[in-house]
């Protein structure tokens, strides 16, 4: 199936009804037309402000409305963030993502956020932030600081969304994506499988993403991590093949986007992750923690990469870091390297 400018629900439903073997074959063919199938982009995600979020997202342990035992933390100091970015770079990541548990950032925090972006860029890393909804001015300021990507997930279909979140509308999410795009920042947006949604809802989510004026450059697909104390703690487990199918359809519908295995990898065995890569996933979060939930340790990822013959993708040289491409693969294999730029001294 050729890439379409706009998809219809019937076309997406047809993909969900397709035999999995045929679907994987189609997804892998499309993937190879646009990407090296042996290259996986590696990102690290840091929670720069944790907990006490006023939103009521039913899956999230950071909501102030749920008793999950999560300790709240104020916005991190800029140098603390940059030290984490150095460690991520030394471990082989090429993109550093910073997440804050806010409904939206306060203007008084913007100078610190801008410094974080500039510092991460000075390290030779791609930068990404997820801070909630943005104003036009805030998006422009982040773009001016050099932010590469902004993450703002749609989470699920418009029809099912109200069952999961009531404190932020679907349109607010779409509006933020528009502001990010208009500011010249690349868009990162995806969703979660396992919220209690139907197959039609999964199709609706992918339809929304693929039919944006410009599809997201990065599409994170999360498997629900059930956290005690949240309303979704007792949800049914996601069938591995259903998750793999969602990855494959995301690849088919958004052939030039990075499809990222995000939250939930700790729950997946190696075989499931391998099939996700075969289905067209070509990005992962690397490190022991995603915001506040577990993620496979680096050594496990390295072992799986070796078994599958996968290599970390080498990114374009950024901000004068002329050695990053040559060092990247070795850095991934040698996580304790001491080599890094001191952004604070720049």
From Swiss-Prot:
<keyword id="KW-0808">Transferase</keyword>
<feature type="binding site">
    <location>
        <position position="97"/>
    </location>
    <ligand>
        <name>[2Fe-2S] cluster</name>
    </ligand>
</feature>
<dbReference type="Pfam" id="PF04055">
    <property type="entry name" value="Radical_SAM"/>
</dbReference>
<keyword id="KW-0479">Metal-binding</keyword>
<keyword id="KW-0949">S-adenosyl-L-methionine</keyword>
<feature type="binding site">
    <location>
        <position position="57"/>
    </location>
    <ligand>
        <name>[4Fe-4S] cluster</name>
    </ligand>
</feature>
<dbReference type="InterPro" id="IPR024177">
    <property type="entry name" value="Biotin_synthase"/>
</dbReference>
<keyword id="KW-0411">Iron-sulfur</keyword>
<feature type="domain" description="Radical SAM core">
    <location>
        <begin position="38"/>
        <end position="256"/>
    </location>
</feature>
<dbReference type="GO" id="GO:0051539">
    <property type="term" value="F:4 iron, 4 sulfur cluster binding"/>
</dbReference>
<feature type="binding site">
    <location>
        <position position="128"/>
    </location>
    <ligand>
        <name>[2Fe-2S] cluster</name>
    </ligand>
</feature>
<dbReference type="InterPro" id="IPR006638">
    <property type="entry name" value="Elp3/MiaA/NifB-like_rSAM"/>
</dbReference>
<dbReference type="InterPro" id="IPR010722">
    <property type="entry name" value="BATS_dom"/>
</dbReference>
<protein>
    <recommendedName>
        <fullName>Biotin synthase</fullName>
        <ecNumber>2.8.1.6</ecNumber>
    </recommendedName>
</protein>
<feature type="binding site">
    <location>
        <position position="188"/>
    </location>
    <ligand>
        <name>[2Fe-2S] cluster</name>
    </ligand>
</feature>
<feature type="binding site">
    <location>
        <position position="60"/>
    </location>
    <ligand>
        <name>[4Fe-4S] cluster</name>
    </ligand>
</feature>
<keyword id="KW-0408">Iron</keyword>
<comment type="subunit">
    <text>Homodimer.</text>
</comment>
<feature type="binding site">
    <location>
        <position position="53"/>
    </location>
    <ligand>
        <name>[4Fe-4S] cluster</name>
    </ligand>
</feature>
<dbReference type="GO" id="GO:0051537">
    <property type="term" value="F:2 iron, 2 sulfur cluster binding"/>
</dbReference>
<comment type="similarity">
    <text>Belongs to the radical SAM superfamily. Biotin synthase family.</text>
</comment>
<keyword id="KW-0004">4Fe-4S</keyword>
<comment type="function">
    <text>Catalyzes the conversion of dethiobiotin (DTB) to biotin by the insertion of a sulfur atom into dethiobiotin via a radical-based mechanism.</text>
</comment>
<dbReference type="GO" id="GO:0009102">
    <property type="term" value="P:biotin biosynthetic process"/>
</dbReference>
<dbReference type="GO" id="GO:0004076">
    <property type="term" value="F:biotin synthase activity"/>
</dbReference>
<keyword id="KW-0001">2Fe-2S</keyword>
<keyword id="KW-0093">Biotin biosynthesis</keyword>
<dbReference type="InterPro" id="IPR007197">
    <property type="entry name" value="rSAM"/>
</dbReference>
<dbReference type="InterPro" id="IPR013785">
    <property type="entry name" value="Aldolase_TIM"/>
</dbReference>
<feature type="binding site">
    <location>
        <position position="260"/>
    </location>
    <ligand>
        <name>[2Fe-2S] cluster</name>
    </ligand>
</feature>
<dbReference type="InterPro" id="IPR002684">
    <property type="entry name" value="Biotin_synth/BioAB"/>
</dbReference>
<comment type="pathway">
    <text>Cofactor biosynthesis; biotin biosynthesis; biotin from 7,8-diaminononanoate: step 2/2.</text>
</comment>
<dbReference type="GO" id="GO:0005506">
    <property type="term" value="F:iron ion binding"/>
</dbReference>
<dbReference type="Pfam" id="PF06968">
    <property type="entry name" value="BATS"/>
</dbReference>
């Amino acid at each position: 199936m050729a890439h379409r400018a706009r998809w219809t629900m019937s076309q997406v439903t047809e993909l969900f009804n397709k035999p999995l073997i045929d679907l994987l074959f189609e997804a892998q063919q499309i993937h190879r037309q646009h990407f090296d199938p042996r290259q996986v982009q590696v990102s690290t995600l840091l929670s720069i402000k944790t907990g006490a979020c006023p939103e009521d997202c039913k899956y999230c342990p950071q909501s102030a409305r749920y008793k999950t035992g999560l300790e709240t933390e104020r916005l991190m100091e800029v140098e603390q963030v940059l030290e984490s970015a150095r460690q991520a770079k030394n471990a082989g990541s090429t993109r550093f993502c910073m997440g804050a548990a806010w409904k939206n950032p306060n203007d008084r925090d913007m100078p610190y956020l801008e410094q974080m972006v500039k510092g991460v860029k000075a390290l030779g890393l791609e930068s990404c932030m997820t801070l909630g909804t943005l104003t036009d001015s805030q998006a422009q300021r982040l773009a001016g600081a050099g932010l590469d990507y902004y993450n703002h997930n749609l989470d699920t279909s418009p029809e099912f969304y109200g069952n999961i979140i009531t404190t932020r509308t679907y349109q607010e999410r779409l509006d933020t994506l528009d502001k990010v795009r208009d500011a010249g920042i690349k868009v990162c947006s995806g969703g979660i499988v396992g919220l209690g949604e139907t197959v039609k809802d999964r199709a609706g989510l992918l339809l929304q993403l693929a039919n944006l004026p410009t599809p997201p450059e990065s599409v994170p697909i999360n498997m629900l991590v059930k956290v005690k104390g949240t309303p979704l703690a007792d949800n049914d487990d996601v069938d591995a093949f259903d998750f793999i199918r969602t990855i494959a359809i995301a690849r088919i519908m958004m052939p030039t986007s990075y499809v990222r295995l995000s939250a939930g990898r700790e729950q997946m065995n190696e075989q499931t992750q391998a099939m996700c890569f075969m289905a067209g996933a070509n990005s992962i979060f690397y490190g022991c923690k995603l915001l506040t939930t577990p993620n496979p340790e680096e050594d496990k990822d390295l072992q799986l990469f070796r078994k599958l013959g996968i290599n970390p993708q080498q990114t374009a040289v950024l901000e004068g870091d002329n050695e990053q491409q040559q060092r990247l693969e070795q850095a991934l294999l040698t996580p304790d390297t001491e080599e890094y730029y001191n952004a604070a001294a720049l």
